Amino acid sequence: TNVVVTDPLSWQYFGKGPVAYGSLFQGEVYDALREPAVEGWSTASYDASAWKSAHEVALEGHISKAGNPNMPWVNDYSGFELIGQFGQTVKQINELTALSVEEVRPGVFVYDMGQNMVGVPRISLSGMQPGTEITLRFAEVKYPDLPEYEGNIGMIMLENIRAAMAQDIYIAKGGQETISPRFTYHGYRFIEITGIDKPLPVESVKGIVLSSIHELASHYETSNARVNQLWKNITWSSYGNFLSIPTDCPQRNERLGWSGDISVFSRTATYLADVPQFLRRHMRAMRDVQRTDGRFPDIAPLGGGFGGMLWGSAGITVPWECYQQYGDTALLSEHYTAMKRYIQYIIDQTIETETNLIVQTRSWGDLCDWLGLEDEKNDKSLVWEAYFIHDLDLMTKMAAALGKTSDAAWFRDLHAARRDFFNKTYIEPESGKTIFSAFIPDKKGQPVDIQTSYVLPLAFGIINEENRNKVIANLAETVRRENTTDRGRLCPSYSLMTGFIGTAWISKALSDYGLNDLAYRLLQQTDYPSWLYSVEQGATTIWERLNSYTHTDGFGGNNRMNSFNHYSFGAVGAWMYNYSLGIQRDEAYPGFKQFILKPMPDPTGKMKYARGYYDSMYGRIESGWREERGMIHYAFTVPGNTTATLYLPAASLRDVREGEKLIRKCKGIEYIGEGSGQVVLKLLPGSYSFEVKKEYPMAGKKRKKGEIARSKGTH
């Protein structure tokens, strides 16, 4: 075997090629007049006599000169080890064509791509004078026609990209040529082009969409067109922010791997696309910058940030989601020591001896329920405690999965103790309302009583049996009533008052405890604050704020801190798959070898159907339901070499038939049990259809005389 390599000291470089400048944040400068100097550079006949020899540079020094005590970056190159690239590569996944062009000022042409996208342009030119300088600038939105924006109306809005210049400069050579940057990327819907005398045809302006998500692994569709657009917005924000690392946003001078964002979105991500290697790479980045005391960073790579426990918990939740979705313990094994060190850090460094409360300082972070509309009314220690208990629950299960029985027992005991502490500290036993702890001494014992304060302990199974029904009722009340924001704005019933953290769990908490009607009302609410409010305002991606833009108030004064491509509020996507479609993992069988089908039709009747699929490692799982003439029709597909546990709403097995046949006589269907208005069946591989009276989706509802459920199936 011959191994052919080159000596690095024999490498050469040419410093005056057409790419004069390239930066992810600032854009690219390309001088096409320099192209002849490097034409044919990779051929044997090319004359490289003018090229210079490369020389070795030590990997030392600092990554950034910026200094911020609240964002302690891993800033020293020393100790860094170069490794081979792994994860999911960035590639072109789509190509868009501009829909329209407007000359907003003389010589200033703005093209609308019709979709907020992430990538680079591909612009065809001809007949340009050599040396002509063409400038491209990129924006997600334009200034609307409102009095406060007089003088800028119709121009692209660049305030929200802050210190990122995000522009490309192209110096033309003449003839047929193409502008297509290689050493940058942009988040944008609108392209401003200057330096040309007249507008280019819209078909000459393309958008090359880049992503580490190469294709979707799922689909979701309903009778509600706005909900369908919301799902599309979630997918586009996933495309745009899964770019080598899971970023918070793709356009401004940030584009960082904020851990809180991927923590709340990881379950949705695993259903949207096949991302195990992408997330495994990110967990490597989190370990690389884990502090010596065990604290996970709030940003990875590089580290730093000021998010706190809820952000650091990504180091626990993401491995768990990957394990459950893909059934592979490899990530658990390589990440386990880091997770255990993190738990020990919480115990040693954040639990106050005198009060037993988890206490955080600004040096670690206190973002809490970021951008929640009632966040200032919350007891932050309640949220921190709930997440710590959730982390302990996951660690118990992951330790057991790895056969670490003594660790699992330790985590289980600690989980039980902290769960008991939560119920005694944060729940008023008579009313079941959440209350302030001694974290804020002058408020101790006063009610918190906001959505997030109930959502987290319910979603995480923290509330004990004595308090549970009262806490559920209190959560329901916070959803049904009008609420007032921290800034004094009155919001209508069925408003989404939660931030990044609470929003990820609110629909699950409602559906887990029989409040599906409220979950669907929240999903389909169009008034502010809600998921569909942004859809009503023309959004094509998920926004950082629920009101990043409105037709009446423009940007509401949030011009700078305002991303229009931020997937965190899109974490509701997991509920769409897990509850609306009912495609759920079976925790006892990670990876969908065995799984659960538990669809929950809309009890309000506003949504008439939902259907979709998830492409598991074993094949496509399909689920759907539709309401028609007083009946709910269900359809499922179970892929080969798997089995599904189906929870079908019906009063008893006697009411479930295949045509006129009893279920016990149907091939591919096995009876498991019944109760609480549900019949539980085991489905072998095949396609199935069932129908039940509309009343049945409300679990526990009594069957009226003469009502039956019918089924048809093939396997």
Regions found by a protein language model. Give the residues of each.
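Extracellular/oxidizing-compartment recognition motifs
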Residues: 1-252, 277-280, 296-301, 330, ...
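Alpha-helical support elements that line or immediately flank enzyme active sites
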Residues: 120-140, 194, 259-289, 316-332, ...
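Non-catalytic C-terminal accessory modules of carbohydrate-active enzymes
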Residues: 4-40, 81-89, 94, 144-146, ...
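C-terminal capping/lid segments that line or modulate ligand- or cofactor-binding pockets
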Residues: 30-32, 253-254, 272, 315, ...
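Active-site acid/base region of carbohydrate-active enzymes
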Residues: 2-20, 190, 200-233, 239-240, ...
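Active-site-proximal structural scaffolding
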Residues: 44-47, 116, 127, 163, ...
